[in-house]
Swiss-Prot record:
UniProt cross-references to InterPro entries, sorted A to Z: 4Fe4S_Fe-S-bd, 4Fe4S_Fe_S_CS, NADH_quinone_OxRdtase_chainI, NDHI
Biological role: NDH shuttles electrons from NAD(P)H:plastoquinone, via FMN and iron-sulfur (Fe-S) centers, to quinones in the photosynthetic chain and possibly in a chloroplast respiratory chain. The immediate electron acceptor for the enzyme in this species is believed to be plastoquinone. Couples the redox reaction to proton translocation, and thus conserves the redox energy in a proton gradient.
HAMAP family on file: NDH1_NuoI
Family: Belongs to the complex I 23 kDa subunit family.
Quaternary organization: NDH is composed of at least 16 different subunits, 5 of which are encoded in the nucleus.
Class of the enzyme per the UniProt entry, highest EC level: translocase
Name the UniProt record assigns to this protein: NAD(P)H-quinone oxidoreductase subunit I, chloroplastic
Organism annotation: Draba nemorosa
Pfam families: Fer4_9 (PF13187)
Entries under Gene3D superfamilies matching the protein: 3.30.70.3270
Gene: ndhI
């Protein structure tokens, strides 16, 4: 008879412990009802990227001295720099500069080590295309600055949403 009573007591303790754990989980679930939603509706709402975000590379043709430091520090030797040596002034003249963003790993080494700061990272991250050859940007495409998320009137950022203004 005694083992049967201790078995029921053990069962009762386990039941109470399980009910306590379920109650704790339910309290955590209820605490999330007071929070704002984290999900954003992507094409219509966009998150503001951080200051150190590494997006598409912006290239300034006039500042480049064709030193090819960006090619040497790139882990995959990605930037293609075509130049011609001007014999009369003994300087390199940049002819073409291109980066294939289908291959780029966005490590930021080219921007970090560029001696003339002709390369910089932008906040653009939308590269979706149907043809991978469209991801090969030349110096003209790299020179265009993308529209900032904050300046785009068609996009509602998370900070401008009506939920954050009301609450």
């Amino acid at each position: 008879m005694l083992p049967m009573i201790t078995g029921f007591m053990n069962y009762g303790q386990q039941t109470l412990r399980a009910a306590r754990y379920i109650g704790q989980g339910f309290m955590i679930t209820l605490s999330h009802t007071n929070r704002l939603p984290v999900t954003i509706q992507y094409p219509y709402e966009k998150l503001i990227t951080s200051e150190r975000f590494r997006g598409r590379i912006h290239f300034e043709f006039d500042k480049c001295i064709a030193c090819e430091v960006c090619v040497r520090v790139c882990p995959i030797d990605l930037p293609v720099v075509d130049w011609k040596l001007e014999t009369n002034i003994r300087k390199k003249r940049l002819l073409n500069y291109s980066i294939d963003f289908g291959i780029c790993i966005f490590c930021g080494n080219c921007v970090e080590y560029c001696p003339t700061n002709c390369l910089s990272m932008t906040e653009e991250y939308e590269f979706s295309t149907y043809d991978r050859h469209e991801l090969n940007y030349n110096q003209i495409a790299l020179g265009r600055l993308p529209m900032s998320v904050m300046d785009d009137y068609t996009i509602r950022t998370i900070w401008n949403s009506p939920q954050t203004k009301n609450g």
